[in-house]
Amino acid sequence: MMEEKQSHYLFGIHPVTEAIRAGRKFEKILIRKGASGPQFTELLKLAEEKELPVQFVPAEKMNSLVRGAHQGVIAYISQIEYVPFEEMVEGALSRKAAPLFLILDGVTDVRNLGAIARSAECAGVDGIVLPAKGGAAINAEAVKSSAGALLRVPVAKVSNLKVAMFYFRDSDFQIVAASEKAEDDMYDVNLRKPTAIVMGSEGHGISEPVLSLCTVGARIPMNGEIGSLNVSVAAAIILFEAVRQRR
């Protein structure tokens, strides 16, 4: 099991630094808490320039992930090829009049991410937008949970979701906040237009800065007492409402 896990990581300060310089993409980089020195300073500088998420963790956690001399640095290897955000949007607009995109704001569970991607692929979504920081890593478990959909649906990572949302708005997309607090039922929202649907985090929903840039809200009507659905289930429901409207 350890050997299988290690195929998903690159470790050692020099190999990781050189891989970043060469343009290798990583989901995130783990650095041992308390690590210091010029090599670590250089690594952090490169990671910031390339907008790669960095997390400081105890040595015990790092030792549990890989066998060998990791030197306080472990990088998660990206399991997919990301596409440039603007290229993804413009490509979809060149192919169809009303593309459909999904924006995930703070979805951190890899299994939820995989399930959402699976539904998105089945619904014919033109792309998924993820934040570079604060979201689930697309690791082997996420790809497996997606039944391979993450290898088929275009995925873009952006350093700032708000910038991406302004781009959608400038491109005449409506941005739909999927929220139980929305005033309108999803059945009353016209999803036949060029649309980007925003799904929020499992615990807190859509963040206020992102919510403020949405142009319309859509609520999934429910009759039970709990009042909320798992984010992957909610995403599937609203995506297939868009499919129904577009038939």
Feature-to-residue mapping (PLM):
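Short beta->alpha connector loops at strand-helix junctions that form conserved
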Residues: 58, 78, 105, 131-132, ...
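Structured adenosyl-cofactor binding patch, chiefly the S-adenosyl-L-methionine
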Residues: 17, 22-23, 141-149, 208-247
